[in-house]
């Protein structure tokens, strides 16, 4: 007479394909005396499905970082002529949404702020207020010479000489104005930076 373990092994092998797990010899059904799940078509089907397939194992931080890089929502903050190129990057020719980079009108739903254009002293408090309303982790792309360091209006009394005096900047995109390709490259650099740092809180 064969043991319950042997019966379970025979039942699994007759269902087709090798088993993934060893027979559960210690957990027996008191009514039948056989291992729990032996002969159950559901367990046999699951066992068969998992027999030739692998599993994807990842750390939680890596999974969150991967998901974040593919679903960045950007807050539009167009201040001058650079905003035209910022709008161009979401048009069909470049289609930045294929990288998971979609625009949002609310700072409370945004991960990234693109400061595009000349930041004046009167606009600086509004920029900081919008930045403070964004949830953590939040990122800022400075687009254009005026946002980077004042640009053409560097010596003007009314212009902030670089928006990094108001908010921390993650990526600088140079140009006057930068092309849509340059902004797209800056977005890809930001995604690479997020993958490299991989922190949930900043």
Curated annotation (Swiss-Prot):
EC number assigned by the record: 7.1.1.-
One Gene Ontology cellular component: respiratory chain complex I
Residue ranges with Polar residues bias: 1-13
Membrane topology: Peripheral membrane protein
One GO molecular-function entry: NADH dehydrogenase (ubiquinone) activity
Cofactor: binding comment: Binds 1 [4Fe-4S] cluster.
Catalytic class of the enzyme: translocase
Pfam families the UniProt entry points to: Oxidored_q6
Biological processes per GO annotation: aerobic respiration; electron transport coupled proton transport
Subcellular localization(s) per the UniProt record: Cell inner membrane
Region (Disordered): 1-32
Cofactor(s) the protein needs: [4Fe-4S] cluster
Binding residue positions for [4Fe-4S] cluster: 81-82, 146, 176
Domain of life from the UniProt record: Bacteria
Catalysed reactions, as listed in the record: a quinone + NADH + 5 H(+)(in) = a quinol + NAD(+) + 4 H(+)(out)
Assembly description: NDH-1 is composed of 14 different subunits. Subunits NuoB, C, D, E, F, and G constitute the peripheral sector of the complex.
NCBIfam families xrefs: nuoB_fam, PRK06411.1
Role played: NDH-1 shuttles electrons from NADH, via FMN and iron-sulfur (Fe-S) centers, to quinones in the respiratory chain. The immediate electron acceptor for the enzyme in this species is believed to be ubiquinone. Couples the redox reaction to proton translocation (for every two electrons transferred, four hydrogen ions are translocated across the cytoplasmic membrane), and thus conserves the redox energy in a proton gradient.
Name the UniProt record assigns to this protein: NADH-quinone oxidoreductase subunit B
């Amino acid at each position: 007479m064969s043991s319950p373990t042997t019966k379970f092994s025979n039942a699994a092998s007759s269902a087709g394909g090798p088993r993934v797990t060893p027979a559960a010899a210690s957990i027996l059904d008191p009514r039948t005396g056989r291992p729990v799940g032996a002969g159950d078509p559901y367990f046999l089907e699951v066992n068969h499905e998992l027999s030739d397939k692998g599993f994807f194992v990842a750390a939680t931080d890596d999974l969150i970082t991967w998901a974040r890089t593919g679903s960045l929502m950007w807050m539009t903050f167009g201040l001058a002529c650079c905003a035209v190129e910022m709008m161009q990057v979401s048009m069909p020719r470049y289609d930045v949404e294929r990288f998971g980079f979609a625009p949002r009108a609310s700072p409370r739903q945004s991960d990234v702020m693109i400061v595009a254009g000349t930041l004046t002293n009167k606009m600086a408090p509004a920029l900081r207020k919008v930045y403070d309303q964004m949830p953590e982790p939040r990122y800022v792309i400075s687009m254009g010479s005026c946002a980077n360091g004042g640009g053409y209006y560097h010596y003007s009394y009314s212009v902030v000489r670089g928006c990094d005096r108001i908010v921390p900047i993650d990526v600088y995109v140079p140009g006057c104005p930068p092309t849509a390709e340059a902004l797209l490259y800056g977005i890809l650099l930001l995604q690479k930076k997020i993958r490299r740092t991989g922190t949930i809180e900043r």
